[in-house]
Amino acid sequence: INWLKLGKAIIDAL
């Protein structure tokens, strides 16, 4: 799992 990509996706969803 790519945590940086996941984190970016979560931030973008906020």
UniProtKB/Swiss-Prot annotation:
Q: Where in the cell is it found?
A: Secreted
Primary location class? secreted
> What stretch or stretches form a coiled coil here?
none
Extract one GO cellular component term from the record.
extracellular region
Tissue localization of expression is: Expressed by the venom gland.
The free-text function statement in the UniProt record for this protein reads: Antimicrobial peptide with potent activity towards many Gram-positive, and Gram-negative bacteria, as well as potent activity towards yeasts (C.albicans, C.tropicalis, and C.neoformans). Inhibits biofilm formation of A.baumannii and Staphylococcus spp. bacteria. Also shows potent mast cell degranulation activity and potent hemolytic activity of rat erythrocytes. Its mast cell degranulation activity may be related to the activation of G-protein coupled receptors in mast cells as well as interaction with other proteins located in cell endosomal membranes in the mast cells.
The protein's name is: Agelaia-MPI
Q: Which organism is it from?
A: Parachartergus fraternus (Artistic wasp)
